[in-house]
Amino acid sequence: RGLEDLSMILCDIGNSTVDCYQEGKVWTLSHAQFKDFSTKERVYYICVNEELLSYLKHRGSYVDLEPYFDFDTIYQGLGVDRIAACCTINDGMIVDAGSAITVDIMSSGVHLGGFILPGLEAYAKAYRSISPRLDMPINPSIALDALPQRTNDAISYGVVKPLILMLEATCKDKRIFFTGGDGKFFSKYFTNAFFD
């Protein structure tokens, strides 16, 4: 076989988007764009979206990686996206800040457990459902060292500060690995953080 036969695409299919990787290049597709995506290469994927998972079962050149993970944990219902992330580190805390914020702790290669929080957009949606006057985006530059003096900052502070405090209390001195659409946003609050 020639080297061109070894080309492949890796995809992480989340609840909101599909992140793809091929030969050092990374790109993001919407679910609709992914359904229209066409390639001659084999596509290896992990998927947490049930609709796309059903769709991909009938695509011959697409390979679901979930059955190939051998991950020992007592956690019930751990998603393949979290399993894949946990398999990449031996010690530390993994924070996938996407549609939901998932947090998992690894110690000496053992999964100690984790928790799930709403993602930033879910918090914003909750505020919108309370009142149209609270329909404001979460401000990623919110100062956390002083109490807010306007509604937009108060909303952002009320979302970001408790999340940061919870992550700090959980990670203690562990390294923190951030991923997901809002991972870069959260990583700036920690000196022991890595974003990928």
Predicted regions and their residues:
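A short, well-structured beta->alpha microelement
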Residues: 24-38
